[in-house]
Amino acid sequence: MKKTLILLAMVIALVILPFFIDHGGEFGGSDGEAESQIQVVAPHYEPWFQPLYEPASGEIESLLFTLQGSLGAAVIFYILGYSKGRQRRDDRA
């Protein structure tokens, strides 16, 4: 029980603490940051690849990103649960 409370407090701290560390911070994407750095380093750079699908709006892009993350988490936790179930089954035998 004590271990659970400590872990819960750590998770809450990890979620809340960033809001107090940098009040004027801006939540920006890594793609935009990389693009601006490329323009600084090599202003005449031409991208050599175009995306296969470009979402119509930022909301759709966020939705697809969230779905991708959810699917990845589902696969990871399925594998973890499956291996835990196999381990329990093998322990009983």
UniProtKB/Swiss-Prot annotation:
Subunit structure: Forms an energy-coupling factor (ECF) transporter complex composed of an ATP-binding protein (A component, CbiO), a transmembrane protein (T component, CbiQ) and 2 possible substrate-capture proteins (S components, CbiM and CbiN) of unknown stoichimetry.
Swiss-Prot/TrEMBL keywords: Cell inner membrane, Cell membrane, Cobalamin biosynthesis, Cobalt, Cobalt transport, Ion transport, Membrane, Transmembrane, Transmembrane helix, Transport
Pfam families: CbiN
Source taxon at top rank: Bacteria
InterPro entries per UniProt: CbiN
Primary residence: membrane
Pathway participation: Cofactor biosynthesis; adenosylcobalamin biosynthesis
MF (Gene Ontology): cobalt ion transmembrane transporter activity
Location in or out of the cell: Cell inner membrane
Family note: Belongs to the CbiN family.
Any single biological process term in GO: cobalamin biosynthetic process
Listed HAMAP family: CbiN
Ion transport found in the keyword field: yes
Protein name listed in UniProt: Cobalt transport protein CbiN
Cited function: Part of the energy-coupling factor (ECF) transporter complex CbiMNOQ involved in cobalt import.
Segments traversing the membrane: 5-25, 62-82
Ion transport is among the record's keywords: yes
Topology of this chain in the membrane: Multi-pass membrane protein
Cellular component GO terms, alphabetical: plasma membrane
